[in-house]
């Protein structure tokens, strides 16, 4: 069950959803979602330095990315076909019986910008800024500004609290993040086993 605006307000008041800084409900609250703002930190792939990324090699992923911090009021230019990681300004904490979903905003999508490739789900017990996988699917560059409303976040009620919420899950790779982080796929056991072959 997706939470309505009144349910979101109640969950914020009770602490089942925590958002820092506190949202301006008049401008950010929709009928069943909260709009979140674009942060200042971006990570981009440096295509010219590497011919490919090997997910079995952690340094391959981290070394292939460069961090860019954009001051407020300045644009981050997404060229046509570009991909970048970014995060929300808001730090979100979910109760053990709530799931979060990051969704695009129509006004942003109409510029050709998608805010997530596939990673829209935030598990119960999640805490951190939401990392977005930004892509420019259009044929023109688009200026994105830190602080602009970039995505919407919806909340769903589970039938019961999770037995092992994300923050308690062994090997949770992104708990508590405050900026976008590169993929930590190389830490997964299946890839560790492949390295041994």
UniProtKB/Swiss-Prot annotation:
Enzymatic reactions: dCTP + H2O + H(+) = dUTP + NH4(+)
GO BP of this protein: dUMP biosynthetic process; dUTP biosynthetic process; nucleobase-containing small molecule interconversion
UniProt pathway: Pyrimidine metabolism; dUMP biosynthesis; dUMP from dCTP (dUTP route): step 1/2
Pfam families per UniProt: DCD (PF22769)
Gene3D superfamilies assigned: 2.70.40.10
Lineage: superkingdom: Bacteria
EC main group: hydrolase
HAMAP family: dCTP_deaminase
Protein name, as recorded: dCTP deaminase
Organism of provenance: Thermomicrobium roseum (strain ATCC 27502 / DSM 5159 / P-2)
């Amino acid at each position: 069950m997706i939470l309505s605006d009144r349910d979101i307000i109640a969950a914020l008041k009770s602490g089942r959803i925590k958002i820092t800084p506190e949202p301006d409900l008049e401008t950010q609250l929709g009928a069943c979602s909260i709009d979140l703002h674009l942060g200042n930190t971006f990570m981009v792939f440096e295509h010219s330095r590497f011919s490919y990324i090997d997910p079995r090699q952690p340094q391959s992923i981290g070394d292939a990315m460069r961090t860019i911090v954009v001051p407020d009021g300045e644009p981050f230019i997404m060229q046509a076909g570009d991909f970048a990681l970014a995060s929300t300004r808001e730090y979100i904490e979910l109760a053990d019986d709530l799931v979060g979903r990051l969704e695009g905003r129509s006004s942003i999508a109409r510029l050709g910008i998608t805010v997530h490739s596939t990673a829209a789900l935030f598990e119960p017990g999640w805490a951190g800024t939401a990392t977005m996988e930004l892509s420019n699917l259009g044929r023109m560059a688009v200026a994105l500004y830190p602080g602009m409303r970039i995505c919407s976040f919806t909340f769903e009620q589970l039938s019961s609290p999770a037995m092992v919420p994300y923050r308690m899950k062994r090997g949770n790779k992104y708990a508590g993040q405050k900026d976008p982080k590169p993929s930590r796929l190389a830490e997964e056991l299946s890839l560790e086993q492949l390295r041994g072959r």
